[in-house]
Amino acid sequence: MSYITKQDKVIAEAIEREFQRQNSNIELIASENFVSEAVMEAQGSVLTNKYAEGYPGRRYYGGCEFVDVTESIAIDRAKALFGAEHVNVQPHSGSQANMAVYLVALGMGDTVLGMNLSHGGHLTHGAPVNFSGKFYNFVEYGVDKDTERINYDEVRKLALEHKPKLIVAGASAYSRTIDFKKFKEIADEVNAKLMVDMAHIAGLVAAGLHPNPVEYADFVTTTTHKTLRGPRGGMILCKEEYKKDIDKTIFPGIQGGPLEHVIAAKAVAFGEALENNFKTYQQQVVKNAKVLAEALINEGFRIVSGGTDNHLVAVDVKGSIGLTGKEAEETLDSVGITCNKNTIPFDQEKPFVTSGIRLGTPAATTRGFDEKAFEEVAKIISLALKNSKDEEKLQQAKERVAKLTAEYPLYQ
């Protein structure tokens, strides 16, 4: 920070205040995590200076011999993590990765089967406001109204009816194990390709705690942050037969120069994920999520689908205590707990209001929170949300958050 402080005090102050916010708040946004100092150092390195259009050994610029090394290592480590035949580590984001797959697998206006956003899907899985919904004819599948789990019979029925060219599996707010084998069987039945967006569960997959979609899917996309605990970015894993098409669609198709400093940080994160303690970490992520869900149930909250198999807990706050997701998010933020409002299946509220909140355990687990800590987190959440207009109770919740975060300091 010393260089930034000398050059730009306003930015330095904003960064410092953001660090203090992260350190003093309990981070429960399911898509966020805390990267290691090594990942941050790689991302802030001199590699940010280097242009390297093309791929290792096939660049349009000179002086790429060392970024060739870092990018090749990132590719090899990703292959080792997931057992993929081919990996492209250049996508700037998960959305860019998804766009590239769509451009390879589809023509404009082709029919695609994707998960309904309000049931747990993602914007890039066919939301009308997103490029995916504008360029392609997405047909939505969802969860069963009673179980709130993916209804595979409905997926099959829709596939047989609409004959999609591509089926997209994966979600941004779904707390149960996804059966990729079933998706593959359905795709094969209608002669469709299968794409899996594993952005939220990639870390669990790498640790062997969730079925690996690489075995079944033609294309697998992911972000490199979230549970994978790397820098913000994207990645595509695919069969060897799609290597050429995927690579030329990323560059020169939809991107120019790759962010080699970010790719180096991806390589570092993948190296960390190959270590034994990464599996231990992911096991704790899942344990903590299960404890959080159970503790909230004991406090009287309804958990979507009745629990969780992964890192994520979806809470029906409107149905439980009458607060909207927006109100719950704001109340928790006021006491130092960060989460996000989220639609729940069959939600009657607008997307900016919602009936639910989405909670995740990866970030707090990274800083050391265990089951006991998450039992306390659930009690604080309950105290705050049930007393959202009581300043005395909210102050008590705030003090309990401060005590908990002090026990598990960030970057110490």
UniProtKB/Swiss-Prot annotation:
Alphabetized InterPro entries for the sequence: PyrdxlP-dep_Trfase (IPR015424), PyrdxlP-dep_Trfase_major (IPR015421), PyrdxlP-dep_Trfase_small (IPR015422), Ser_HO-MeTrfase (IPR001085), Ser_HO-MeTrfase-like (IPR049943), Ser_HO-MeTrfase_PLP_BS (IPR019798), SHMT-like_dom (IPR039429)
Catalytic activity: (6R)-5,10-methylene-5,6,7,8-tetrahydrofolate + glycine + H2O = (6S)-5,6,7,8-tetrahydrofolate + L-serine
Residues that coordinate or bind (6S)-5,6,7,8-tetrahydrofolate: 117, 121-123
Top EC class of this enzyme: transferase
The enzyme's E.C. designation: 2.1.2.1
Taxonomy, superkingdom: Bacteria
Gene Ontology annotations of biological process type: glycine biosynthetic process from serine; tetrahydrofolate interconversion
Compartment(s) where it occurs, according to its Swiss-Prot or TrEMBL record: Cytoplasm
Residues marked Plays an important role in substrate specificity (site): 225
GO cellular component: cytosol
Sequence positions bearing N6-(pyridoxal phosphate)lysine: 226
GO MF, one example: pyridoxal phosphate binding
Gene3D superfamilies attached to this UniProt entry: Aspartate Aminotransferase, domain 1, Type I PLP-dependent aspartate aminotransferase-like (Major domain)
Keyword annotations from UniProtKB, A to Z: Amino-acid biosynthesis, Cytoplasm, One-carbon metabolism, Pyridoxal phosphate, Transferase
Family statement: Belongs to the SHMT family.
NCBIfam families: PRK00011.1
Cited function: Catalyzes the reversible interconversion of serine and glycine with tetrahydrofolate (THF) serving as the one-carbon carrier. This reaction serves as the major source of one-carbon groups required for the biosynthesis of purines, thymidylate, methionine, and other important biomolecules. Also exhibits THF-independent aldolase activity toward beta-hydroxyamino acids, producing glycine and aldehydes, via a retro-aldol mechanism.
Subunit structure, as described in the record: Homodimer.
Protein name according to UniProt: Serine hydroxymethyltransferase
Organism placement in taxonomy: Bacteria, Bacillati, Bacillota, Bacilli, Bacillales
